[in-house]
C-alpha cells in the first residue's frame, strides 16, 4: 500500500525531505510518494501557471495520473491520498473525479467550498485569492470554472473511499464549516458504507493545536487511520 501526498497550488514546491514519523509507515511495508503536479513549481514557473485559474483542473488530472502510474508500474497496490488546505481541495476534487482509485483519503483543513468562499469578498483572505483562482464576482467564466471543480459543489451519488477530514475551530484561513458542510453533503449523497470521519479540533487553527507534542498526536492519529484502512494495525 502507498500514501500519496499532493498540494499543487500557489507555486509551492513539495521538496522531498526526511521524516522520522513516516518511518512508522515504511516499517509496516507502506510506500510514501509525493506527486509533483501542476500548480506547484517543481518543474519551473510554467508548471505553476499551467495549474491555476482556468487551467486548475490540470492539478487534479495530474494527481489522478500519478496514482494510475503507481498502480500500473506495480509500485503500489491500494493507495491512500493525503493533502491539506489547498491540498485538501486537491483531495476533494480527485475523489469526485476518480474515487474508485483509492482505498482511503485524508483531507486536512480542506479548502472545499471554493465557490462560496471566493464569492464572499467580506472574508479578509478572499480578495488576495482571486489571483490564484479567479474572480467569480466579476467574471462569469471564472465562476463557471470554479463551480466545475469545487469539491462541495460536485459531490455525486457514488461510492467514496474511507475518508478522514480534519478542521480547526479557530482556523482563519479555511473556516471550519467548509469541512463540516462537505462531510454533511458526502454523508447525504454517497452510496457506500465506508467510514467517513470529521475531526474538528476545538483548540486549533490552520496549522493545528499549539504545543510541543500536539502535532505528534495529530500525526499519530492520522497514521493510525491510514494503517487501519489498510488492515495494518
Language-model region placement:
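Active-site-proximal cap/loop segments of hydrolase catalytic domains
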Residues: 35-233
Amino acid at each position: 500500500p502507498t500514501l500519496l501526498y499532493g498540494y499543487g497550488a500557489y507555486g509551492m514546491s513539495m521538496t522531498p525531505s526526511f521524516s522520522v514519523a513516516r518511518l512508522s509507515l515504511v516499517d509496516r511495508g507502506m510506500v510514501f510518494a509525493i506527486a509533483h503536479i501542476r500548480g506547484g513549481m517543481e518543474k519551473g514557473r510554467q508548471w505553476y501557471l499551467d495549474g491555476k485559474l482556468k487551467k486548475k483542473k490540470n492539478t487534479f488530472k495530474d494527481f489522478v495520473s500519478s496514482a494510475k502510474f503507481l498502480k500500473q508500474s506495480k509500485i503500489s497496490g491500494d493507495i491512500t491520498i493525503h493533502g491539506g488546505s489547498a491540498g485538501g481541495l486537491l483531495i476533494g476534487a480527485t475523489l469526485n473525479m476518480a474515487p474508485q482509485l483509492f482505498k482511503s483519503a485524508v483531507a486536512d483543513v480542506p479548502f472545499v467550498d471554493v465557490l462560496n468562499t471566493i464569492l464572499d469578498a467580506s472574508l479578509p483572505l478572499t480578495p488576495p485569492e482571486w489571483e490564484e483562482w479567479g474572480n467569480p464576482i466579476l467574471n462569469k467564466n471564472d465562476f463557471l470554472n470554479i463551480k466545475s471543480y469545487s469539491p462541495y459543489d460536485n459531490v455525486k451519488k457514488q461510492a467514496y473511499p474511507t475518508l478522514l477530514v480534519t478542521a480547526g475551530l479557530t482556523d482563519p484561513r479555511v473556516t471550519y464549516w467548509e469541512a463540516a458542510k462537505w462531510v454533511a453533503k458526502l454523508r447525504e449523497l454517497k452510496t457506500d458504507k465506508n467510514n467517513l470521519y470529521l475531526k474538528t479540533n476545538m483548540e486549533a487553527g490552520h496549522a493545528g493545536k499549539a504545543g510541543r507534542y500536539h502535532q505528534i498526536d495529530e500525526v499519530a492519529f492520522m497514521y493510525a487511520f491510514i494503517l487501519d484502512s489498510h488492515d495494518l494495525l
